[in-house]
């Protein structure tokens, strides 16, 4: 808990064996779990964190949209508060507002959905709400549509999908309200008055996952270069008949291609270590 170094180490080691598993791990614990832990309040921690950690509650991180990519501030998904029923209505107003390339989309039972929080007709910017995707029989809940992204050229162990919401209602308590919530009178409140500052504070709480992506890439590159180096020290290449076969590592042309790449993981390792310490 709260140990970025340990989490990065897990990411790097997992990436040396199975990148699909690494991404699934990151989605479950880093993105979905991180959203609940870092954007939610104590009531969310008590209700969900242990189940997420045990893998009993599988979840998604539904931020990216088809029409907006990583332009989070322009997301079209709406989270509209219904005062009379004390519920939040989650809605995708069009195809482009669908959540795109979401990991765990085919297995997840809940999603942290990001969208524009609207109270009394006024948008208070991007917030996140927990939405149940599937019931106890793993059937999609009413108003939830999920579409598989299909075969990919890699990482096919990840169930990437698209998700749309058609006026799906969730309790007000499902709003992750650490940086902004709605009180019992239906009035919006936030410890950060400035919307832009609040937006960047929310996103900043999740930046640790970006560091872990680098750790995973580093782990994969170490394995690839280890294989390439060992192979170069065993594989022999024939030449003129009178000469003995030579190791391909003895060829200057092979050294020129391989050795600079062998140096880079050392550089990235120390750079990531420095970034972890700064974080």
Mark where each language-model region is.
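Internal helix-loop-helix
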Residues: 1-55, 107-110, 269-272
């Amino acid at each position: 808990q709260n140990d970025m170094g340990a989490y990065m180490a897990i990411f790097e080691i997992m990436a040396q064996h199975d990148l699909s598993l690494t991404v699934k791990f990151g989605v479950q614990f880093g993105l979905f779990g991180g959203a609940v832990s870092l954007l939610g309040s104590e009531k969310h921690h008590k209700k969900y964190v242990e189940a997420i950690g045990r893998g009993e509650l599988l979840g998604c991180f539904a931020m990216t949209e088809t029409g907006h990519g990583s332009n989070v501030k322009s997301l079209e998904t709406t989270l509209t508060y219904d005062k009379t029923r004390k519920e939040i209505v989650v809605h995708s107003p069009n195809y482009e507002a669908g959540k795109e390339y979401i990991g765990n989309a085919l297995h997840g039972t809940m999603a942290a959905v990001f969208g524009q929080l609207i109270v009394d007709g006024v948008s208070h910017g991007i917030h996140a709400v927990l939405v149940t995707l599937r019931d106890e029989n793993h059937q999609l809940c009413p108003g939830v549509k999920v579409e598989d992204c299909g075969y990919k050229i890699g990482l096919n162990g990840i169930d990437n999908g698209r998700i749309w919401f058609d006026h799906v209602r969730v309790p007000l308590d499902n709003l992750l309200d650490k940086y902004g919530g709605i009180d019992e009178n239906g009035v919006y409140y936030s410890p950060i008055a400035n919307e832009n500052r609040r937006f960047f504070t929310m996103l900043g709480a999740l930046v640790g996952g970006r560091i872990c992506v680098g750790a995973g890439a580093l782990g994969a590159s170490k394995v690839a270069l280890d294989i390439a180096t060992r192979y170069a020290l065993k594989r022999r290449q024939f030449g003129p008949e009178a000469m003995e076969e030579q190791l391909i590592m003895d060829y200057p042309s092979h050294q020129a291609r391989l050795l600079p790449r062998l140096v880079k993981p050392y550089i990235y390792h120390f750079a990531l270590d420095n970034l972890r310490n700064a974080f």
